[in-house]
Amino acid sequence: MSAGEITEAVRLHKVKRPGGVFWFDLHQIEQNSDGTWLRGPVGSPWGAPHDCGVLSVPVVVLLKVGRPWAAWWVGDPADQRLEIDVCLPPEVTEAGWRYVDLELDPVLHERDERVEIEDWDEYEEAYGNGWMTTDDATLARTTAERCAEVLRHGAEPWLSRGWQLLRQSR
C-alpha cells in the first residue's frame, strides 16, 4: 500500500469504562515501523452508546499493537491538535482495531505549542470507582507523563508524519 492510499473502512472501537463502546469508521492509509495509520475525513461515521454522527473535522490516527497509546491528529481549525489517548495496548480485531481508554490524554495544541495532560478528573473517577486496576492506573499515569514529554520535545519522526497525513486529508 502506498502512502496516503485509501483502503476499505476499518472500524476503530474505543472502550470507555463504564461508558461503553465508541466506534469510528476510518481508512487504513499506511503501515510502517511507527504503526498503523488511519484516516477519517470529514463525514466519516462514528457512534457512541447514546449518539451517532459524522466527523466534522478530519483526523489521522496512529496505533500499534503492544504500545499503550493511540495518537489522534485533529484538524479542528479553531484548535488543531495532537491528542494521545493513553490506553491498554490496542488490539487488531476482525473489523479493525480496539482499545480500552485509560482516560488521561496528553495534548499538543499546535497554535501555541502548549502541552497539557487532560482528563485527570475522569482518571480519578475511573480509578476511584474501580473501573481500572491499580496496574492500569499506574500505566496511565506513567504513559501520560512520558507522552507529554515526547510532545514537548517534538523530535520523534512520527509527529511530523501525522501532521503531513492530516494536511493531505483535507
Protein language model regions, located:
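Conserved, surface-exposed functional patches that form binding/active-site neighborhoods
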Residues: 77-130
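Short, surface-exposed, low-complexity cationic segments
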Residues: 121-148
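Beta-strand residues in well-ordered beta-sheet regions across diverse protein folds
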Residues: 39-40, 72, 85, 118
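Hydrophobic/aromatic beta-strand elements that line small-molecule binding cavities or substrate pockets
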Residues: 26-28, 59-60, 103-107
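Cysteine/selenocysteine-centered motifs that mediate thiol-based redox chemistry or coordinate metal-sulfur cofactors
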Residues: 143-170
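Charge-rich, low-complexity N-terminal segments
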Residues: 1-56
